[in-house]
Amino acid sequence: MSDEWTPRTQLGKLVASGQIKTISEALKTKLPLKEYEIVDYLLPNIKDEVIDIKRAQRMTDSGRRMTYSITVVVGNEDGYIGLGIGRSKEAAPAIRKALINAKLNIMEIRRGCGSWECGCGRAHTLPFLVEGKSGSVRITLKPAPRGVGLAVGNVAKIILRMAGIEDAWGFAAGHTKTTVNYALAVYNALKETAKVRINPGIVLSTPIYSGSVINVSGHTD
């Protein structure tokens, strides 16, 4: 554990004491995630990318002032994804705020081989069709067979890749040029993969994977 991080929350203390060893365990506690360092520790391979930068000017008594609004996506490319927005008078602080917020919004998604055209049983696509919306933007994500790739818009490609989705078809409607709403719609669609309840009595034709399948052990000392 880094000396630079002193846990301040119950969840942080459980991680620091070794009682929680994976991000999956942390999220399942339902305890609020208020320390981004928890994500850094349990997902040391997490990546981040800026997907939108907006600058706005407003008049004040002292003249024109510039405000940055920046959107960042984080993920481990293996079942975990987060999205955050940060605002500040300068770009660097806005990026840092967005990065922290993205980590605090980290979530576990489900993957599988939900395409009837494939049936390989691997965690390369969505397990079933999901939909998400934000503002006027609505997006539908459908499972695709291996080799199709990500047949979606550029922003959606980044988010899906960060989440560990390799193949998918997507259909969007609304003001999709509004990047923030488009990104949030994709994020909300992925959130639906974890919300759908699966009857344990039903025999699935293909496995559904929650979270990481490449490295499920989290941080190792």
UniProtKB/Swiss-Prot annotation:
Pfam families linked to this entry: Ribosomal_S5, Ribosomal_S5_C
Alphabetic keyword roster: Ribonucleoprotein, Ribosomal protein, RNA-binding, rRNA-binding
Domain S5 DRBM: 46-109
Entry annotated with the keyword Ribonucleoprotein: yes
Biological processes, Gene Ontology terms: translation
Record GO cellular component, one term: cytosolic small ribosomal subunit
Entries under InterPro entries matching the protein: Ribosomal_Su5_D2-typ_SF (IPR020568), Ribosomal_uS5 (IPR000851), Ribosomal_uS5_arc (IPR047866), Ribosomal_uS5_C (IPR005324), Ribosomal_uS5_euk/arc (IPR005711), Ribosomal_uS5_N (IPR013810), Ribosomal_uS5_N_CS (IPR018192), Ribsml_uS5_D2-typ_fold_subgr (IPR014721)
A single GO molecular function term of this UniProt record: rRNA binding
Keyword RNA-binding attributed: yes
Subunit text: Part of the 30S ribosomal subunit. Contacts protein S4.
Comment field on protein domains: The N-terminal domain interacts with the head of the 30S subunit; the C-terminal domain interacts with the body and contacts protein S4. The interaction surface between S4 and S5 is involved in control of translational fidelity.
Function: With S4 and S12 plays an important role in translational accuracy.
HAMAP family: Ribosomal_uS5_A (MF_01307_A)
Family listed: Belongs to the universal ribosomal protein uS5 family.
Name this protein carries in UniProt: Small ribosomal subunit protein uS5
Phylogenetic classification of the source organism: Archaea, Methanobacteriati, Thermoplasmatota, Thermoplasmata, Thermoplasmatales
Gene field: rps5
